[in-house]
């Protein structure tokens, strides 16, 4: 609905933003179909640790960086965009990306966006001071959609995000846009690497769902599907060599820790133990895998090894069938510890979720597990996204089903949301020790120590039965075999600048 990078929350739309805009750093194809980090608008940068523990980055912008109307991309475009993102008046859902920048808390408290420690030394030098070292700043913050540069002259009146006024600084710019059906982007001839960009034109078709997209693909109307329908995935999954593409998202059962029932740890544990994660993942689709922790596969660890955070953290919830059966027997005991010696004593409860997605099947599977194992009555409450958001923000729920995602590829993005004062803590979880662990990790300059603190924090969430991770999200995409060069990252973003005709 909008081409305002600061306001985007649709992960599917991220691929469009990455085609139209470019940040200080960018992701690109490494030549083998994998994503690699490379310089974007910034041709180089320096990092300096200051006497007070803050860290200053100086980015030198490319002299050839241009907007699609020929205007030069300047440091002030980044200053404006980042201050606007942090400004409470903007009401961006992505403002927490700026929380690592010095002055962010003052901006949020006072509304004075000038307090954010970003500046333009000159038109080609963008300076950022962080309140502490941040392991994911370059790869996470400096590539994010929400921190893309913006033109002050085109943004302040809002007209710059509607046709025909849309101006962008990426490899493509918008040539036509029908909000309900299709966006067409053409090569930006002002782009500094315009001659290396693949297709002359990209057409993003907004299908009503994966089944409609598949019909368009079969008819030859589109060349790439970002999300294959379940029927096609089920067929592909019969091939033992086929693997889905993991994305950085974990479907979780959320407990309201201030509700009469789920303030009791034994009840939370009973509901967690009763979950058969393999069955729940399968109910959601063949592309999903059972969750063995909260932080999903693919998120980097300390960097000392090639192992990711999940591999290093190990299996926090076994998905072995024998272990699941034993845990389900234990679940009934946990209810008795909470004083519910008979299932007839346990009141009916409601599971809140967004309907019209895989959630419908997953919610039904969970309902059956809790009924079969615990003998409790769980009523399903499928609602619209808007109603779901309103009820979660008001903490008006007992149980909820939600996919937990992060704005950057770091374990912190999945863990700091559960801190007592976090705006994202929708479960009313409070643990002072947990808050300290996250705080120490955030301030640590030693990556190995930082990661160790984060592993301890994840384990504490499981010890406290804070949320219950159910499955890791996955996806499956398909490019027509006459083409090559689309690469995807862990967020499910697709990059198209390297697409070429397949000559093999």
Tell where the protein language model's regions lie, with residue ranges:
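Gly/Pro-rich hinge or "lid" segments in bacterial periplasmic/extracellular proteins
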Residues: 29-32, 113, 124, 130-201, ...
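Aromatic- and charge-enriched surface segment that lines or borders ligand/interaction sites
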Residues: 44-97, 127, 218-219, 261-263
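Surface-exposed binding/hinge segments that line
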Residues: 58-60, 77-79, 90-151
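Detector for C-terminal structural segments
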Residues: 274-305, 357-367, 391-504
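Structural transition elements
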Residues: 288-337, 358-360
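Ligand/substrate-recognition segments at binding pockets and active sites
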Residues: 321-406, 475
């Amino acid at each position: 609905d909008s081409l305002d990078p600061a306001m985007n929350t649709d992960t599917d739309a991220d691929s469009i933003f990455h085609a139209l805009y470019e940040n200080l750093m960018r992701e690109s194809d490494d030549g083998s179909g994998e994503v690699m980090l490379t310089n974007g608008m910034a041709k180089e940068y320096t990092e300096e640790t200051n006497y007070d523990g803050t860290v200053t980055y100086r980015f030198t912008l490319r002299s050839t960086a241009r907007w699609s109307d020929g205007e030069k991309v300047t440091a002030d475009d980044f200053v404006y965009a980042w201050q606007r993102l942090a400004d409470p008046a903007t009401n961006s859902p992505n403002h927490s990306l700026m929380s690592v920048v010095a002055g962010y808390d003052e901006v949020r408290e006072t509304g004075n966006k000038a307090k954010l420690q970003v500046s333009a030394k000159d038109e080609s030098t963008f300076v950022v001071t962080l309140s502490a070292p941040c392991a994911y700043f370059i790869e996470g913050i400096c590539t994010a959609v929400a921190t893309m540069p913006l033109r002050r002259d085109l943004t302040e009146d809002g007209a710059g995000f509607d046709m025909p006024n849309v101006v962008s600084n990426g490899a493509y710019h918008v040539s036509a846009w029908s909000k309900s059906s299709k966006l067409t982007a053409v090569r930006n001839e002002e782009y500094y690497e315009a001659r290396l960009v693949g297709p002359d034109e990209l057409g993003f078709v907004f299908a009503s769902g994966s089944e409609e997209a598949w019909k368009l693909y079969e008819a030859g109307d589109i060349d790439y599907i970002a999300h294959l329908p379940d029927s096609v995935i089920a067929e592909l999954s019969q091939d033992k060599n086929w693997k889905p593409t993991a994305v950085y998202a974990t479907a979780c059962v959320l407990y309201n820790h201030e509700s009469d029932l789920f303030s009791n740890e034994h009840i939370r544990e009973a509901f967690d133990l009763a979950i058969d994660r393999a069955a729940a993942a399968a109910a959601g689709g063949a592309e999903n895998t059972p969750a063995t922790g909260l932080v999903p596969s693919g998120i980097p660890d300390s960097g000392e090894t090639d192992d990711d955070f999940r591999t290093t953290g190990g299996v926090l919830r076994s998905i072995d069938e024998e272990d699941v059966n034993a845990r389900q027997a234990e679940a009934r005991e946990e209810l008795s510890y909470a004083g519910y010696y008979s299932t007839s004593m346990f009141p009916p409860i409601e599971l809140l979720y967004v309907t019209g997605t895989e959630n419908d099947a997953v919610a039904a599977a969970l309902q059956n597990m809790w009924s079969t194992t615990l003998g409790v009555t769980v009523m399903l409450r499928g609602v619209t996204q808007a109603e779901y958001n309103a009820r979660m923000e008001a903490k008006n729920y007992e149980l909820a089903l939600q996919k937990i995602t992060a704005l950057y590829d770091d374990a912190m993005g999945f863990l700091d949301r559960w801190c007592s004062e976090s705006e994202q803590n929708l479960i009313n979880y409070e643990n002072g020790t947990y808050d300290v662990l996250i705080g120490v990790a955030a301030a640590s300059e030693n990556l190995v120590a930082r990661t160790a603190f984060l592993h301890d924090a994840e384990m504490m969430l499981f010890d406290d039965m804070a949320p219950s991770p159910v499955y890791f999200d996955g996806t499956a995409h398909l490019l027509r075999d006459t083409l090559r060069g689309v690469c995807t990252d862990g967020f499910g973003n697709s990059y198209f600048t390297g697409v070429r005709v397949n000559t093999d």
